[in-house]
Amino acid sequence: MSYSTSQIRNVALAGHPGAGKTTLFEALLHAGGALQTAGSIERGSTVSDFDPIEKERGHSLDAAIASTDHLASSGQQIHLNLIDTPGYPDFRGPALGALAAVETVAIVVDADIGIAHGTRRMLEYAKQ
């Protein structure tokens, strides 16, 4: 299916390590129908953490992109390009590259720890 630019949204998920970016990525893809079942970090079955080292360590090393469709409240079909970004500072390069490619950054905050240092850093980068 082809989409007009007005129907496309490019969204990066960013935040502190372990905040839930990959889990949200999986849930959004599942809700949009792109995945039959949302993957799990614990099971090593996520779409975005496909590298064996990512599965072993339980966190993202690189940014990953996947797409799904969403019916907006206006009735317009929206095509979402979602980018799951790594949270650890050692892998911040791919996250910053993703921020440059999107018009929207969703900052994911861990409800247990609140706004952490990595959250603040990514928020500042997103503002640039």
What are these regions (language model features)?
Residues 1-96, 100-101, 105-109, 113-115:
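P-loop NTPase switch module centered on the Walker A-proximal segment
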